[in-house]
Every structure is written in C-alpha cells, then in structure tokens.
Amino acid sequence: MGEVVLRLEGITKNFGALKANENVSLNLEKGEVLALLGENGAGKTTLMNILFGQYTADAGRVEVFGKTLPPGMASAALDAGVGMVHQHFTLAHNLSVLENVILGTGSLWSWKVRYKQARQQLLELANRYHLKVNPDAKVSSLSVGERQRVEIL
C-alpha cells in the first residue's frame, strides 16, 4: 500500500431533500490516477466542489497529504495543492490570461507581486506542463481550447 495523498471519508451532502452524496469515501495513493464515473446528477461535481472547498459537506472530512482541510475553504485547498478545472469556465473575459491566473490563485500569488515575477511563474508552469499560453491575451479573444489551458493553470 502506497502513500495516501488524498482521502475523502464519509462525505455526505444534501440539498434540501436531495442527497447529492451519501457516505462517500475514497483514497488516492501517490502515483495513482482516479476517475469518477456516473450518470448526470450522480453527485460527481458536488463531490469535487467539496474537495475544492467551494461546498461544505454535511458530514465527513477531506484530507490532503494527511492534513484535514477546513470545510468550505477553497483557499485552504489551494494552499494544500488542490486545483480545480471547472466544468464551466470561470474566467473573467475582460481580463488577460495573467490577470485571471493571479485572480484565481489569490492565496498563492499576492496582487502585490510584480507582474514580471507573476508572468515568469506563469510561463514556467505553462512550459512544465506543455501548455502554450500568451499571458497578455484577453480571455475574450481565446479559443475554447486556450481557455481550458488557462483554467488548468
């Protein structure tokens, strides 16, 4: 058995009378790839929103690298290294790629960070993951594929 890097334990989430998730538990070990499969409305997106701290579970807990994340705090998830590529784009169309990345990772990059440093970090990440992006391009001018790359970054 390898090192558990992500643990969801007993996750339950209700929306009124609707049970979106009921006692969901899973472990992800270092080096594993995990896919959630299910029909529309099965609760996959709800579970991911709980992992990322956008929703608060009614019961259960989320651990990343052995540390329990406080419920409903996306900033804590980001600080722990959890990222989220949203099902629907969440980019600000009137901002540049660089401005969107800075905005989306506020807990990681302070707005006080000089653009030059932020640009360098963005380009290093893009290069590391082979994602071609233009930091100065307005999101409104990007193709769907380019917007997806920005979401990943």
Question: Which stretches of residues belong to each language-model region?
Answer:
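Glycine-rich phosphate-binding loops of nucleotide-dependent enzymes
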Residues: 1-153
